[in-house]
């Protein structure tokens, strides 16, 4: 789908090795370097210190929220703070029970196992996780047919960190086994401008405060998008200007990239205008809306909608999606009386 080609797409994208190295360099390594998410950060600091004082593995943690807010980064920070190794995988990759068993049996005491998109685990793999999380035991079947038998293997104490954009899609038994649930929220402009400034310093890129704020304002409250836009605005600044990112340079670059003052690109505008023009402002059902804009319903629900709802441009009602007054004002369209 065209969603994956969006510059402001918050999911990770296939990028060149150089950009991947830059992304890694821009990531904070410790909690003190991590900006925003103040409540979650404060809680995590206490939980980590308590686990270290007791010389225990940190309790299992579920990090959830919209894409691009730093779930993977936070998992790496936890491992760094605890001074342990981290092994990373994702739900769709773990197809068989043996895939998970291989990871679990190679963990050292206190290690972190990070599973991204944990809501996409198969039921077979999930069953293996239950005793591993609760009792640090692995139940596996040896042999087949009448000769098959179950054996238990002891595992070292470890921390499972699951990340998901859809916490509601987790089964209740799995969700209940996470002792530390952390919800990440969209970032405010102040925190996001601090992240932009820090990333610019890592890149040795001159940027003034107004330029960082303008970039932050159009980044949809999402650090991954902010860092991606920073790289593209850097290209513009180096080719068209003297290399420094000022407010004017940021505005010109982002306008050229078709990202408007609210951080919307053509897909956001297409979605909002479909509700306004094709469905008279709504309400409109998700399936009809997906067909109207040629996008998958999951993409609308998980990627496009959250920010638009949080910013007050769309309301989600039992009867469907409705465009708000703010959406009409954004396009200078007079809202019809109902």
Curated annotation (Swiss-Prot):
Binding annotation for DNA: 297, 316, 321
Gene Ontology molecular functions: ATP binding; ATP hydrolysis activity; four-way junction DNA binding; four-way junction helicase activity
Residues reported to bind ATP: 27, 68, 71-73, 134-136, 177, 187, 224
Key words of the record: ATP-binding, Cytoplasm, DNA damage, DNA recombination, DNA repair, DNA-binding, Hydrolase, Nucleotide-binding
Region (Large ATPase domain (RuvB-L)) location: 4-187
Function description: The RuvA-RuvB-RuvC complex processes Holliday junction (HJ) DNA during genetic recombination and DNA repair, while the RuvA-RuvB complex plays an important role in the rescue of blocked DNA replication forks via replication fork reversal (RFR). RuvA specifically binds to HJ cruciform DNA, conferring on it an open structure. The RuvB hexamer acts as an ATP-dependent pump, pulling dsDNA into and through the RuvAB complex. RuvB forms 2 homohexamers on either side of HJ DNA bound by 1 or 2 RuvA tetramers; 4 subunits per hexamer contact DNA at a time.
The protein's name in its UniProt record: Holliday junction branch migration complex subunit RuvB
Origin species: Shewanella woodyi (strain ATCC 51908 / MS32)
Taxonomic lineage from the root: Bacteria, Pseudomonadati, Pseudomonadota, Gammaproteobacteria, Alteromonadales
């Amino acid at each position: 789908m065209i969603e994956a080609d969006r510059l402001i797409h918050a999911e990770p994208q296939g990028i060149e090795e150089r950009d991947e190295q830059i992304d890694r360099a821009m990531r904070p390594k410790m909690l003190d370097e991590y900006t925003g998410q103040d409540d979650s950060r404060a809680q995590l600091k206490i939980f980590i210190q308590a686990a270290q004082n007791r010389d225990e593995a940190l309790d299992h943690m579920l990090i959830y929220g919209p894409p691009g807010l730093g779930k993977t980064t936070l998992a790496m920070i936890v491992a760094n703070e605890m001074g342990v190794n981290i092994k990373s995988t994702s739900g769709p990759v773990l197809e068989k029970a043996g895939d998970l068993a291989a990871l679990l049996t190679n963990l050292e005491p206190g290690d972190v196992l990070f599973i991204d998109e944990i809501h996409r685990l198969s039921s077979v793999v999930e069953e293996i996780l239950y005793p591993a999380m609760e009792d640090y035991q692995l139940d596996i079947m040896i042999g087949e047919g009448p000769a098959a038998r179950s054996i238990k293997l002891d595992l070292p104490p470890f921390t499972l960190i699951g990340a998901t954009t859809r916490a509601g899609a987790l089964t209740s038994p799995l969700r209940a086994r996470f002792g530390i649930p952390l919800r990440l929220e969209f970032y405010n402009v102040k925190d996001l401008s601090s992240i932009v400034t820090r990333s610019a310093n890592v890149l040795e890129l001159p940027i003034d405060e107004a330029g960082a704020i303008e970039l932050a304002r159009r980044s949809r409250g999402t650090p991954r998008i902010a860092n991606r836009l920073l790289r593209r605005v850097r290209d513009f600044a180096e080719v068209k200007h003297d290399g420094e990112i000022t407010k004017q340079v940021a505005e010109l670059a982002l306008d050229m990239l078709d990202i408007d003052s609210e951080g919307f690109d053509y897909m956001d505008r297409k979605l909002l205008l479909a509700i306004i023009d094709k469905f008279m402002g709504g309400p409109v059902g998700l399936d009809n809306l997906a067909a109207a804009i040629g996008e998958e319903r999951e993409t609308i629900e998980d990627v496009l909608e959250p920010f638009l709802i949080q910013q007050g441009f769309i309301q989600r009602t039992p009867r469907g999606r409705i465009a708000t007054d703010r959406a009409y004002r954004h396009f200078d369209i007079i809202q019809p009386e109902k």
